[in-house]
Amino acid sequence: MYIIGENINSSNGRIRSALEKGDWDSLMELVCTQERAGVQAIDLNTGAMGTRETGLLLELAERTQQVTDLPLVIDSARAQTLEDAAPKCRQKGLILNSATMDDASLLPLTELAAQLGSRLVVLSLKNGSAVKGGDEMAEELKKLSERLKALNLPRNRVWVDPVVLPLAYYPDDVGELLARLEQIKAAGFSAICGLSNISFDMPRRRALNRALLPVLMAHGLDAVIMDPTDRVLMDMAKAADALLSEGDGVMDYLRYLRSL
């Protein structure tokens, strides 16, 4: 399980305030806290900063690379912002987060990923809505496969997100989410998700996040963007990986425990 730290995100009021004030010390401390918690990469999102989004993402990426060698996940709904920020990311393992399945997003970002040799997250969203499982998902995954082939972009560099919808507003979607995840995996793609979406606008958010993660892992999830400062959630992620892994999951789990 590839774990990406979600905490540097301007949708969080505390992070937005720090970005507005230029409080880089507290932001970099949070980067380091996530690294100590055991993540493999750091997500950086300045999307709530309006016209300052791109400039702040560039500075955030530069400063983050001064305090950690972990790969960066540059996170924006705007393809141009990702195109502007990507050349500033010097560390190996860059992840572009994210394209949708709309041509206006998918075409430039698959080309950028091919040029840079980076990974790319593709959200199963089109025209602002989640792609439905079944024939609609099959058609979109086929188009994605054809696009990757045309660019010689290896499939293993693309993670498809089945899109976790908030339980508060889509209480019947979890079964559909699992079906979308299974269809993505059956098509030969790796799968990633933003875990905390499930608990948006719900009480006791951490309980819902903790409940969903092992279910998704059992259905083939490969990577997750989540809060690594929730120690119980991190423990569950590592333990579930040990139980489900056919490789070095147990040894990874023991190494993780020794690092605490």
Stretch-by-stretch model annotation:
Residues 8-10, 46-50, 78-80, 100-102, ...:
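Active-site-proximal loop/turn and secondary-structure-junction residues that shape catalytic pockets
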Residues 2-6, 40-44, 72-75, 94-98, ...:
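Hydrophobic faces of well-ordered beta-strands that scaffold small-molecule active sites
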Residues 84, 90-122:
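Active-site-proximal beta-alpha core segment in soluble small-molecule metabolic enzymes
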Residues 3-29, 53, 97-103, 127-135, ...:
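Active-site mouth loops of central-metabolism enzymes
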Residues 36-39, 69, 91, 118, ...:
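A structural motif
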Residues 35-70, 163-171:
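Glycine-rich, proline-tolerant flexible connector loops at the mouths of alpha/beta enzymes
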